[in-house]
Amino acid sequence: MDTRLLELLVCPVTKGPLEYNREKQELTSRSARLAYPVRDGVPILLESEARTLSDEELGL
């Protein structure tokens, strides 16, 4: 994923920053506890497509 694009994207729920997980092909929002999929290089920033992050994934 292009780092310039990542700097512009925000979580649609919290408007907070997103972190890219290359291995899982996801953008994560720690504040919303959601992970948005990236498919074929395109971030899918729909809450209905996101999965909830566990405490373990958040390092809590």
From Swiss-Prot:
Gene3D superfamilies, alphabetized: 2.20.25.10
Gene Ontology, cellular component aspect: cytosol
Annotated TM spans: none
Entry superkingdom: Bacteria
Pfam families: Trm112p
Family membership: Belongs to the UPF0434 family.
Annotated PANTHER family: PROTEIN PREY, MITOCHONDRIAL, ZGC:162634
Protein name: UPF0434 protein Rfer_3156
Taxonomic classification: Bacteria, Pseudomonadati, Pseudomonadota, Betaproteobacteria, Burkholderiales
